[in-house]
């Protein structure tokens, strides 16, 4: 692995500047801030990748309310890459160049079982309000449920208002909340009234991305990622941080 790191560093790290990594926080277990600094799946992975490129790394938190706005920071130089549990979609591929996917996951549904004991999944949402974060890939899924008259409406929260959305499940601000399974599993741990009632609503490939046309950095990150996949590092990080709500891409 050390030899691999040296090769990758020599070929992929032309810059001696820190690798600036954009991420939308809080989004545990992918990334979250603690009193001791940032932690999470993406945080640990990018620390490893930066080391293999012989570069320091710097976390640049994205402050916008719409997740899709994060990609503009690549073009304006705010950061060199994004590692933020980002699903690879055709629309996003027009805004950034994605490396090979590192994780496959899917949307899940959370409810307050004391308010809605009979809701066991998306099939039981008729007449109910679904909460989503603005720009999250759950938003078009929820919109489709409403369009098909399988739910009443969608309530859109700013991206950093996830805890408000979860509080609203109990207060009545919304009836269900949709988000990737590792994230919902993390948040319900300390909220005994909330339960993840359905997983696997979608199948989504997640990946790191760079600004359009930055093939040198994309190749360097891709090679480092492939080495970390082969030596068991990424599978170990998935098990450690993401649990059963995520898996290796096949």
State the predicted function of each range.
Residues 14-85, 94, 231:
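Extracytoplasmic small-molecule ligand-binding "clamshell" domains
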Residues 33, 46-56, 138-158, 188-191, ...:
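Ligand-binding cleft/hinge of the Venus flytrap
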Residues 60-72, 117-118, 156-167, 202-204:
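Short helix-initiation/N-cap motifs at beta->coil->alpha
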Residues 24-25, 104-111, 163, 181, ...:
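Periplasmic-binding protein-like
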Residues 55, 63, 86-90, 94, ...:
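A conserved helix-loop-strand patch within extracytoplasmic ligand-binding domains
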Residues 68-69, 84-95, 141-145, 168-202:
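A ligand-binding cleft/hinge motif common to bilobed small-molecule-binding domains
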Residues 40-53, 113-116, 123, 128-137, ...:
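Extended ligand-binding regions for polar small-molecule ligands
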Residues 4-37, 117-118, 123-129, 250:
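Immediate post-signal peptide segment of exported/extracytoplasmic ligand-binding proteins
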């Amino acid at each position: 692995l050390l030899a691999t790191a040296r090769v990758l560093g020599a070929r992929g790290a032309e810059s001696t500047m820190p690798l600036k990594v954009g991420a939308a926080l809080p989004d545990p277990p992918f990334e979250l801030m603690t009193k001791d600094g940032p932690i999470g799946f993406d945080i640990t992975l990018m620390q490893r990748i930066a080391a293999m490129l012989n570069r320091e790394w710097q976390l640049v938190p994205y402050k916008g309310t719409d997740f899709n706005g994060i990609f503009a920071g690549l073009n304006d130089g705010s950061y060199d890459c994004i590692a933020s549990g980002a699903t690879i979609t055709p629309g996003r591929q027009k805004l950034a160049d994605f490396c090979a996917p590192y994780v496959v996951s899917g949307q899940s549904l959370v409810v307050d079982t004391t308010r809605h004991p009979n809701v066991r999944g998306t099939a039981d949402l008729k007449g109910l309000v679904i909460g989503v974060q603005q720009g999250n890939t759950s938003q078009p899924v929820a919109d489709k449920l409403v369009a098909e008259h399988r739910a009443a409406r969608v309530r859109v929260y700013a991206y950093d208002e996830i805890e408000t959305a979860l509080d609203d499940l109990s207060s009545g601000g919304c009836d269900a909340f949709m988000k990737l399974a590792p994230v919902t599993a993390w948040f319900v741990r300390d909220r005994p009234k909330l339960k993840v009632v359905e997983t696997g609503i979608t199948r989504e490939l997640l990946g790191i991305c760079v600004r359009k046309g930055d093939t040198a950095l994309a190749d360097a990150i891709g090679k480092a990622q492939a080495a970390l996949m082969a030596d068991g590092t990424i599978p170990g990080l998935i098990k450690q941080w993401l649990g059963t709500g995520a898996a290796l891409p096949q």
